């Protein structure tokens, strides 16, 4: 069976670390294939102050991990951290779209979008929406609303937000390494 390759990159204040793992359906845990770690010389307090250094640090860390793993990666999960990251709770509500009142994946997407529609300053953006629970016609604390029946669907979510310039700068540094 062919392994699915995943990669994670952590760009921190003190080091840039990369891990490459192989995952297949028969193995419960990912198998570590390669790691890379180099000192971080372009970040301070979670913010990039030298893009060229950060680009080089990411490239060096990824190259170490690729060399150890014997594979070339083309996508990665990248950590985003720093003092600019904030969270807040939000709620959204919609009317279920189907005539038979069965909640679909589309309804869940719509209610999550409704919960994500908040006023943010122009320099901040939502990074992630984490559903906490749903309420269906006053039935609270529903973990998975898919396939259930109801007229009114509410969602309580945790919104993770950050400063847009920091997010874009990190993405630019990662993407510069192809």
Protein language model features and the residues they cover:
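Nucleotide/phosphate-binding catalytic cleft detector across ATP-hydrolyzing
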Residues: 1-15, 19-178
